[in-house]
Amino acid sequence: MTRQHRRMAGTSAALLLSLAGVLVPGAAQAQDPPARTALRVCQDPNNLPFSSTRGDGIENRIAEVFGKALGLPVSYYSFPQRLAFIRNTLRYKLPGDDYPCDIVMGVPVGFDQVSVTKPYYRSTYALVYPQGRGMDTVKTGEDFLKLDPAKLASLRIGVYDRSPASVWLSKHGLVDRGVPYQIMNADPAQYPGEIIEKDLAAGKIDVAIVWGPIAGYFAKRITAPKLVVVPLKSEPGVQFDFQMAMGVRYGERDWKQQVEGLLESRQAEIAAILAEYGVPLVDETFSAPGRR
């Protein structure tokens, strides 16, 4: 998944500063917080299928479900996810001011910049290709690798740099066929689904390998050519599937428990939203033997 790669500090001083950045917000919660007047969500304003200023993303829809359950209106604090998102949203606080938002609706399990809830879905990277272009027999990643060598050698495979997809191409000797896309693009007008909606649909690339929710959503939006989504199994050296959860500030245990209660009580509604957006869901058994 493209946004779960995080770097650690390289020196003792930097490490101490980063730890302080994590611990200070938690310490600030020692006193009882004021009663909530809204469900305040931290979001990327242009990150479909997850979130947008129009409120038509997966996470927007789930936030509305939560707001209704809590009897609170939903408000959003928007900031591009690629630009120090947590520091500038969930953990952003000026002296004398309140935090601008209280929850991040989608973070990978293990993400250490927030206190992570229990997971609410697991998805995997997926391969997307147009029907009728000589790949219709491909139903799995293994099928793709078994295509005629001449066919494989002709394909332009779009992948985001530093993603599991680029690692997979390298492992299977297909680096030369890769068309790299930048994960960290500073242009806020660009969005992850462009690789499918603009380039794959227009024939600029022949295949795209992207995070499953992106694959499923944008493949459904394209009517011509018809696109096929093939979930990929993790294998030794390449982890494709990840559990997704929500994130709150460290130290806010009561709020975290309340969010986890909503995840449990609204499980059916969340599942329906994920299905509507075409998210490929997998469980822990969906992997190649000995993948780790």
Sequence positions of predicted segments:
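Extracytoplasmic small-molecule ligand-binding "clamshell" domains
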Residues: 32-107, 111-112, 186-190, 276-277
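Acidic, polar ligand-binding/catalytic clefts
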Residues: 75-151, 231-239
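Boundary at the C-terminal end of the N-terminal hydrophobic targeting segment
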Residues: 28-30
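Extended ligand-binding regions for polar small-molecule ligands
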Residues: 57-70, 131-164, 236-281
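Bacterial N-terminal signal peptides
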Residues: 12-22
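Periplasmic-binding protein-like
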Residues: 44-47, 122-126, 134, 220-263, ...
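Ligand-binding cleft/hinge of the Venus flytrap
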Residues: 63-73, 77, 141, 145-151, ...
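Alpha-to-beta junction loops
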Residues: 72-73, 91-106, 155, 196, ...
